[in-house]
Regions:
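Hydrophobic transmembrane alpha-helices and their immediate loop junctions
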Residues: 1-202
């Protein structure tokens, strides 16, 4: 990858202007990728059945953007605020190549979600489990919501919340550098196996 990650963070500042911009671009690209990925899925069939062929596209787009923004922000907050609790600095940096790969793979029917990475001025591996934990919890919320709101229009939102976050957790835990899974496995194999098992079950 030809992207160069740099970090220049004021210690008492939560987010820099560049980080906010990088997060915004990454969220938009990832949202578009999920819309492309779900375009021929059972989600679209359900939306067409429930709301008609014309309405299903705007509903899918709004839902994907809303859930990706919500899930991605909490995912990155997991990194940032955990790092700050350790007295460390962290910032998200988008990857142009990663964003391109994310879009191209979604067109091919699968998703390699690599919009960027979090740069941390330290290496406490507990930090690398925090974002996956956020996605696992959100997936569980989605599953519970599916049961609680079954046979209502909201079941679609919770089903997509569960599907999207289970995917993000599982993908991020793959033991492939530079994904967090490779760092967690090198740090503590039992923790990695437990986290991956939970993500896979969801």
């Amino acid at each position: 990858m030809d992207d160069t990650y740099t970090i220049n963070v004021t210690p008492d500042k939560r987010f820099s202007g560049r980080e906010i911009g990088d997060i915004a671009v990454a969220m938009v690209v990832l949202s578009i990728a999920f819309v492309i990925l779900y375009r021929d899925s059972q989600f679209m069939w359900y939306l067409g059945y429930a709301y008609g062929d014309v309405a299903r596209w705007p509903i899918l787009i709004v839902t994907c953007f809303g859930l990706v923004f919500f899930s991605f922000l909490l995912h990155e907050f997991g990194h940032k605020f955990t790092a700050q609790n350790f007295g460390l600095r962290s910032e998200f940096r988008m990857s142009r190549i990663g964003l391109f790969i994310t879009l191209i793979t979604s067109l091919l029917g699968f998703l390699f979600a690599a919009p960027g990475a979090v740069v941390i001025n330290g290496y406490p591996c507990l930090l690398y489990t925090s974002d996956a934990a956020v996605n696992i919890v959100l997936a569980m919320v989605g599953i519970v919501g599916c049961f609680a709101f079954n046979h209502t229009p909201l079941v679609f939102v919770f089903l997509m919340l569960a599907n999207l976050n289970a995917f993000l957790a599982f993908f991020n835990l793959l033991p492939i550098p530079p994904l967090d899974g490779s760092k967690i496995l090198a740090w503590n194999a039992p923790v990695y196996v437990a986290a991956m098992a939970v993500a896979a079950l969801e």
